[in-house]
Amino acid sequence: MHVPDGCINAPVSAATGLISLGTIWAYIRSAKNLVADRLIALTGMMSALIFVLQMINFPIAAGTSGHLLGGALAVIVLGPSLGIICISIVVVIQSLLFADGGLSALGVNLLNMAVVTSLIGWLVISTWKKLFNEGYSSIISGSFIAGLLSVVFSSIAFVLEYAIGGTVAVPLGSVLIAMVSSHVLIGIGEGIITGLIVSLLLRVRSDLVYVNQNKENKNNPTSFYGIFILLILLLTLITPYASSSPDGLESVAESYGFN
């Protein structure tokens, strides 16, 4: 889902950068009162986990793959403020150190992958909890829906940006259908991964899951950090075996000639 350089023109790239920075700065300010040692550690570990997960592409159809975006997962575990900061850190590191997504497109990628996914993920999980009960099953099912919809809306955001500032003329209706279709499948994968990780965290350290209202915890904190580190190590080991097929955006871009 990383947008490369030259896909979106300079004015729109600059505008998305300003919107992203303004939104992220607002959440940084609101997070000042939330910062504690355990939250800093948890945010760092979530950033590392999502960073590794974004490197692992899973196949969704013949010749196409997808990977976790992580916005919904981050806000469910960390809350909206620290969640959006967590994903922003991941996107910036990927752009600056690994050239994953163009530097001139950093604002676009921050908006789509950090801001949109986090805000949609938080809106969905918050609404889901109001409509249904506060139990673990509600949180887990809501996590799946939040993950799915966050990816779909991120793909729609890209099409809107391309409609305004795309550098190559394309049939926007067809591109929208192709983007949403492929990202519904990717979103299902995102929802499953999000639900599984949230389920694991609820079992190990339920008090550290932000959306969980029952903060009582009787689990050993050592088991939480141990499992978290082990999960990151295992994911790192399987990264070389991830799908090498182009992701949803790359596949659509190749089909319509705006890559």
PLM region spans:
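Alpha-helical membrane segments and adjacent membrane-interface helices in multi-pass membrane proteins
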Residues: 54-117
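Hydrophobic core segments of alpha-helical transmembrane domains in multi-pass membrane transport
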Residues: 16-29, 47-54, 118-123, 147-159, ...
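Juxtamembrane non-transmembrane "cap" segments at the membrane-aqueous interface
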Residues: 153-156, 244-259
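Alpha-helical transmembrane segments and their helix-start/interface "positive-inside/aromatic belt" motifs
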Residues: 69-70, 135-147, 219-230
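Short helix-perturbing small/polar motifs within transmembrane alpha-helices
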Residues: 112-154
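Hydrophobic transmembrane alpha-helices
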Residues: 2-73
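Hydrophobic alpha-helical transmembrane segments
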Residues: 14-15, 40-45, 84-88, 111, ...
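Glycine-rich ThDP/TPP pyrophosphate-binding loop and its adjacent helix/strand module
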Residues: 142-147, 157-218
